[in-house]
Amino acid sequence: MYVVFEGIDCVGKSTQISLLKEIYKDAIFTLEPGGTELGKHLREILLNKTHPISKRAELLLFLADRAQHFEEILKTNQNKLIISDRSFISGMAYAKDFENDLLFTLNSFALEDFFPQKIIFLKGDENLIQERLSQKELDSIEKRGIEYFLSVQDKLKKVLHFLKEKISIEILTLDAKESKEKLHQQIKEFLQ
């Protein structure tokens, strides 16, 4: 089973994944971008830009990472439990300047139509996101501000709705304000 955690920065994806690592010791844990050696280099380019990158070039770098991630991680472990911190869904949401149909087609190509079966979508309100952003050093994407993150979160919701029409997926939407223990319990039940 291929499971992905989705949500903007600071909603607790990494915390919940860490808790699952204690339970699912044989699972494959990965992330996008950066789940492969190529992906680590691309992630560094994308998060710590020293030169401006066009939106189209940025999209194609993310797609290159996704295609490599599919070949190295997803394809070789299709019969195992795979838990990923983000996926193509975030890629579609962050690529706000492009149409969903185009993004879906490009991602289908990069993934050879291998999509997650279960999605855990953690969402946060403005106060929670602002509080958590203020507690960390920000990368170039995080420096875009709270309004940017809220618009991405809104786009994530729209992308998930769009995907329900395209592929067979189960989605669990959770409020990131809940305690990590309560969220963990709900996630464990969803994965059963």
Swiss-Prot record:
GO CC entries: cytosol
GO biological process: dTDP biosynthetic process; dTTP biosynthetic process; dUDP biosynthetic process
Keywords: ATP-binding, Kinase, Nucleotide biosynthesis, Nucleotide-binding, Transferase
GO MF annotation terms: ATP binding; dTMP kinase activity
Family annotation (SUPFAM superfamilies): P-loop containing nucleoside triphosphate hydrolases
InterPro entries (alphabetical): P-loop_NTPase, Thymidylate_kin-like_dom, Thymidylate_kinase
Pfam families: Thymidylate_kin (PF02223)
Catalytic activity: dTMP + ATP = dTDP + ADP
Annotated coiled-coil segments of the chain: none
Domain of life: Bacteria
Enzyme Commission number, as recorded: 2.7.4.9
Residue numbers binding ATP: 7-14
Family as reported in the entry's similarity comment: Belongs to the thymidylate kinase family.
Main function: Phosphorylation of dTMP to form dTDP in both de novo and salvage pathways of dTTP synthesis.
Protein name as catalogued: Thymidylate kinase
Organism for this UniProt entry: Campylobacter jejuni subsp. doylei (strain ATCC BAA-1458 / RM4099 / 269.97)
Gene: tmk
